[in-house]
A protein has these predicted regions:
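Non-transmembrane, solvent-exposed regions of membrane trafficking/translocation machinery
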Residues: 22-31, 49, 64-75, 81-428, ...
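Small-residue-enriched core segments of transmembrane alpha-helices in multipass membrane transport
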Residues: 12-15, 430, 517-539, 550-557, ...
Length: 997
């Protein structure tokens, strides 16, 4: 074998690297066992802090470097954040109240929901339609974009700047998210920008047990501002005038036909004060309601907002949380713009106010926007440090801040100019505190106080230290997996992997005798070792789908060994010596192995690019496994054989057993003659499946429709039909469903699209609370609180053990990506076969057969949904399975076509039909062996891999069966028909390119 030294050197380096990286996992496990022997928790932590692995690496470094476990194995949280591009544009634009700008933004938002065009392109298109003759520079030649956009800039230049600014905002958001996660203390998080999906950031956080807290941390924009304020006695008269204006019913375009009242005049017309949270009268409920409606009519604003007194500083009023929406319409509407001073801005408090008897009463503050650019005189970018602690006077939790020199100077000037007044500390548009300034504050120190908990101050300090988010980021997809479910997945993964591995070992020995079988099995062991080592070095997390990818790569490795051994057996039957037979067996099998592995790699790369989460985990391990299996099966095993043969050993080695010696040998099936019948059966099956699409359709998961999934573990067996009835009452008007995930009817997946279009961060908690209340009312759960119901560790009484959310924009992109990824896979394989075989007949035959393979798998999911004991929903994992079927199925077709190509080259004058028949018969043993060995693996995953992986395993199992049959009965006959016509045009001459490596 040539390049033997390179092979040995590569093997040694891979072995050393794998040992090094995998050793961190063993070191961490050892230190954990030693620490567990120490009873005192503080002493435990001291021990972990003191250890040094190899004298260099700390325990924390070992944790970060060991092989990571994904969410489905360890439990945790996976989210996809989307940075709002429209919000970035609104921040950059000057004329935000311009009608054309507002209309263009609204139309672009609506179009984005159903278009694959990016938001900037859509906005530019609609702005040109709504403002003909106007240029984008009129909107974006602002102080913020000074030096980048000027009044003379062309639209193309402005568009280029906008795209750069959006990308900068996304990059900054990525940095902020990473900083927040690191400061939160998550071990081995996976944070990455999703390529091809503008503004989306994926965050995987294994081990997270507080999803609500993490949602707030990730979505907070950290836009910290310090504002000057109006005093209450200055602001309240304007609110009274606005109340009068609203009561009179004056519209937005009413001209000033009557002279506006002065604030002092309006002050005389005060409504009767209402006691917050109490009835307005002691009469009946009907009278109370009538009086309240009359009060709202006479005083639309001040019947809901209780104003304060003269000593309230910037606090102008109180209101119940239920009235804030109505008040917002009043204070942010058109009338408010005409009545309130241009520099007045009203903001709510972040938390309910202290000193108010009723609950959920929030304060309204009057902010003074008196800067030329409309920005706060001091912002959070001057904060250099933030610490959580306790106020030394009140003992309440607070956040103290330290500013840089510029911030300290401006803070001193701001406080000096506002002695005796309040300065509002505003974070993300809500007021956290508005303390009175008693004197100039120098040194750049300040504190934020409020109704905080210790956890709130920690998260707030973390958020401030990490910096402000350049634009609001919202969670558009989410998955939460409980740690107990993860432990079960680990057990299932280990069992399925171990059993599949043992069965493959037994199968190889049974088919190819002990020594050849064990050498192939040794290659499998080395393959797994290298795969795990490379995964660890990349710091990639091992997931359940990743284990499935690794198991499937074992099938690919077996395929390579089967090809080599079948070739060696052929050479031995021709009477060649062992040394020559081994050399020619490896040489003749190389091109088929190379082509089949490369086509699988093409599919794996497409899976990785278009997939997210579990699909990427599967693709990663599959790609690494394919590369490792090629190296171990083709090169390392050959080194072993050549070493032994050069020493005069194994000269009489047998590559068969009595059982397999004559298996599928010397067969003369006339497959091409059967093609008419097989085409007929194929068309009938295709029509059945297509008919099923129209009649039954496909059960689409939330990946394609958008919505929320909750996997609920009930205490007692519960029928899905009963849960569905309850869901109709819990989420009226929504599409909801319930599906049993186990045989005991205790684990049920609940799906709903309840308010999935809303971007409010409170909707998730709202949906979970509604679900808890509804199930508890129906007697299906007995948890005492919604917090216990949401805790996956508390199983008694019923609880949510995992959850996921997919927003409508993600669902749209998943649908588009699924179609594109399958089409790209087919086109890529068509082109590769065309380049390698240089004959369009093979490309046409393989592509048509692969399309039928995909159709049959999808058709089975339609035909058998509701029949099998597990879900056959179409989700991202299913699309991954279809692509994997395409990648695997092409292997068999490449092997058959490789033999046809070889025979046509050896016997160019022989009958073309005989050539095809003989080639298929010659590779029949390999086809059966490979398919059977792969089916062994897939059946183990199907029955032992757990509910989450069963649909994938079923799709793959059916795909392997269809793929094997289509290689013989679809791909080859079509290639035969196309090639037969081509040969007729060539007057009997055959042109076949030699594509051997």
């Amino acid at each position: 074998m040539q390049n033997k030294g390179i092979v040995i050197c590569t093997a040694v380096l891979l072995t050393l690297a794998s040992i090094f990286y995998l050793s961190f996992s063993f070191a961490t496990a050892y230190y954990d066992r030693q620490a567990a022997k120490i009873k005192d928790p503080i002493a435990q932590q001291d021990y972990k802090d003191s250890v040094k692995y190899l004298g260099i690496y700390s325990y924390q470094k070992c944790l970060e470097t060991q092989i990571g476990l994904g969410l489905d194995l360890k439990g945790g949280m996976n989210v996809i954040l989307e940075v709002s591009v429209p919000d970035v544009l609104e921040t950059l634009a000057d004329h935000k109240t311009d009608a054309a700008f507002t209309k263009s933004m609204a139309e672009a938002r609506a179009e984005e929901e159903k278009s694959q065009s990016d938001f900037i392109s859509l906005f530019v298109k609609y702005y040109h339609q709504n403002a003909p003759g106007h240029r984008l520079a009129e909107l974006f030649a602002t102080q913020q974009l000074q030096g980048k956009v000027n009044p003379q800039s062309s639209d193309s230049e402005v568009e280029r700047v906008l795209r750069a600014e959006v990308q900068t905002a996304i990059d900054n958001a990525f940095t902020v998210v990473r900083t927040r996660i690191d400061k939160f203390g998550v071990v081995q998080p996976n944070i990455q920008k999703l390529e091809g999906q503008t503004g989306r950031i994926m965050v995987e956080m294994p081990g997270i047990k507080e999803p609500e807290r993490m949602r707030k941390l990730l979505q907070g924009s950290a836009n910290l501002e310090f504002w000057e304020t109006y005093n209450a006695e200055e602001a309240i008269p304007y609110l009274q005038q606005l109340d009068t204006r609203l009561a009179a019913g004056e519209s937005a375009d009413t001209t000033a036909q009557t002279k506006a009242e002065k604030p002092q005049q309006a002050a005389a017309k005060k409504p009767a004060k209402l006691q917050l949270g109490k009835a307005t009268d002691k009469g009946s409920a009907a009278q109370d309601k009538a009086l309240l409606e009359q009060a709202h009519k006479e005083h639309p604003l001040l019947s809901r907002l209780q104003t304060t007194g003269a000593n309230a500083l910037a606090l102008v009023g109180y209101a119940s949380v239920r009235d804030t929406a109505a008040i917002n319409k009043c204070i942010y509407g058109t009338e408010a713009k005409q009545v309130l001073p241009a520099d007045m801005k009203l903001l709510w408090s972040a938390t309910p106010e202290d000193g108010v008897t009723a609950k959920n009463i929030y304060g309204l503050y009057a902010i003074k926007v008196n800067t030329p650019n409309g920005q706060a005189p001091l912002e959070g970018d001057v904060v250099t440090d933030a610490k959580d602690g306790f106020n030394h006077v009140s003992g309440q939790p607070e956040v103290s801040m330290t500013m840089n020199s510029d911030g300290a100077r401006r803070w001193a000037a701001l406080t000096k100019a506002n002695v005796g007044r309040a300065i509002a500390i505003v974070l993300d548009g809500v007021v956290y505190s508005a303390p009175r300034v008693n004197g100039e504050i120098d040194g750049g120190s300040s504190a934020i106080t409020g109704n905080f908990t210790v956890e709130t101050t920690k998260d707030l300090a973390n958020t401030l230290k990490s910096g402000r988010m350049p634009a609001p980021a919202r969670i558009v997809q989410e998955e939460v997996v409980g740690p107990t479910l993860g432990a079960a997945s680990i057990q299932q993964g280990i069992e399925s992997f171990a059993i599949a591995f043992v069965l493959l070992i037994v199968y190889m020995v049974l088919m190819y005798n002990f020594i050849p079988g064990m050498i192939a099995n040794l290659a499998l062991v080395v393959n797994v070792f290298f795969t795990l080592g490379i995964l660890t070095s990349f710091q990639a997390a091992l997931t359940m789908s990743g284990i499935a990818g690794m198991v499937l790569s074992l099938g690919t490795a077996v395929d390579a060994n089967v090809l080599i051994y079948e070739r060696i057996k052929e050479e031995l039957r021709l009477g060649k010596g062992m040394k020559q037979a081994v050399a020619e067996g490896y040489g003749n099998a190389f091109s088929a192995i190379f082509d089949s592995n490369l086509t699988s790699l093409i599919t794996g790369v497409i899976l990785y690019i278009f997939g997210t989460g579990p699909i990427q985990g599967f693709a990663t391990t599959w790609i690494i496994g394919i590369v490792c299996s090629f190296f171990t099966s083709v090169f390392l095993t050959r080194l072993v054989y050549e070493h032994q043969l050069n020493k005069g050993r194994w000269e009489h080695l047998k590559y068969w057993t009595p059982f397999s010696k004559n298996l599928m040998q010397d067969k003369h099936y006339k497959f091409m003659t059967m093609s008419k019948s097989t085409f007929g059966v194929t068309i009938i099956l295709a029509l059945v499946f297509i008919g099923s699409f129209f009649v039954r359709g496909l059960a689409q998961s939330i990946d394609f429709t958008g919505g929320r999934n909750y996997v609920v573990q009930f205490e007692k067996p519960t029928e899905p039909e009963q849960v569905r009835e309850v869901l109709n009452h819990i989420f009226p008007g929504c599409t909801s469903n319930a599906l049993s995930l186990g045989t005991d009817n205790k684990t049920i997946r609940i799906s709903t699209n309840y308010k999935i279009e809303s971007n409010s961060p409170t909707i998730d908690d709202q949906a979970e609370t509604l679900l808890y209340n509804g199930l508890k009312k129906a007697g299906m759960v007995s948890q005492k609180s919604v917090e216990a119901f949401k805790n996956p560790d508390v199983r008694a009484g019923g609880s949510i053990i995992s959850s996921s959310k997919v927003g409508p924009s993600v669902a749209k992109d998943v649908t588009y990506g699924a179609i594109i990824s399958v089409l790209i896979a087919l086109i890529a394989i068509f082109l590769y076969i065309l380049v390698r075989f240089r004959n369009v007949a093979f490309s046409v035959g393989s592509t048509v057969a692969l399309a039928f393979d995909a159709l049959f798998v999808i058709g089975l999911f339609s035909l058998l949904q509701g029949v099998l004991p597990f879900s056959l929903e179409v989700d991202q994992t299913f699309i991954g399975a279809v692509l994997t079927v395409i990648g695997y199925s092409i292997n068999d077709k490449v092997v058959v076509f490789d033999r046809i190509r070889e025979n046509l080259k050896l016997h160019p004058k022989r009958d073309i039909q005989a050539q095809f028949n003989d080639s298929i018969n010659q590779t029949l043993a390999r086809t059966i062996n490979t398919s059977f060995s792969t089916l062994i693996v897939l059946l183990v995953i199907l029955f032992l891999g757990g509910k989450s992986i069963q649909p994938f395993a079923f799709a793959m199992t059916s795909g392997v069966v269809f793929g094997t049959l289509s290689s013989i009965f679809i791909a080859s006959p079509i290639a035969y028909l196309v090639m037969g016509r081509k040969i007729q045009y060539l007057d009997g001459s055959v042109e076949i390119a030699d594509a051997k490596a």
